[in-house]
Amino acid sequence: MFISQSKIDDLIASDGAFLDLTTELLRGCADLNAPARLSIVTRQDLIFSGGQIAREVAARFGCETQHLAREGSAFCAGDEIFSARGSFESLHKAWKIVQIVFEYSCKISTYAHEMVALMREANPRCVLGATRKSFPFAKELCVNALIAGGGTMHRLGLHDSVLFFSNHIRAFASFSEFCAQIAKFKERAPERKIMIEVASEREFSELLKYAPDAIMCDKMSPGELRACVLKRDETAPQIKICAAGGINKNNCAEFAATGADVLVSSAVWNQGVCDLGGKIEFI
């Protein structure tokens, strides 16, 4: 995952732009240049992610990363997930920035991993696709964490895919009038997949006649979604079905079992943080 140096600098500036007042008060009482070691330990089972950002932050403070796991690695409560060596003063500047990156990133990758495991148990072909609702100013961290957890991005942004929502369809006098334009949309963007959101079985059935590449069923019950999958299988098996609306770890297996191809979810982005601890010791 490419993360620009300016993003790393912005992250550091948000917490350490000036001086570390607390550590500065120790000057004269302790050797702030003495070599020390920072260790980040997890208090819960997790799927690791965020290592690249942590290493870059540590390096910007002149600290050397000693232990850095592979993205997507599994850790148990009590395991060390990251360590770095540097001066006592520098490690205190890097410490919380690194720990907070891991707290958010690992929570996303862990939750995504748990969802994917539940989905695949119900339907091995079903894919988790996260929405573009990642929290602001942190897309690189969020996307990297999602991938580490086994998920994919449903959409990175407006630029990378075609998805007609009901708000787009209101530009037409009727749903049927919109559907009649699908062939033209394909001509105008021949290398792109055309996906359309529907909110009812009636709209789904009508849309099947026009052969879009994918249909996103929004806020349907598992029963309604299963009925749509059966209709698709009977008439247009090449069309992919995405399910969206309130899908999370508690219900993803049920939705995956309907036969949907992709479960679209924002749940991975709003699960809080992992429980981690940081310790700095002189060496």
Locate the predicted segments by residue.
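Long amphipathic alpha-helical scaffold regions
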Residues: 239, 245-247
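Short secondary-structure boundary segments
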Residues: 219, 245, 266-267
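Short alpha-helical segments enriched in small residues
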Residues: 5, 279-282
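Residues that form or flank phosphate/diphosphate-binding pockets in enzymes
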Residues: 223, 250
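Acidic/glycine-rich phosphate/pyrophosphate-binding loops and surrounding catalytic core
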Residues: 1-197, 203-210, 214, 226-227, ...
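Short acidic, glycine/proline-enriched helix-loop-strand junctions
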Residues: 234-240, 283
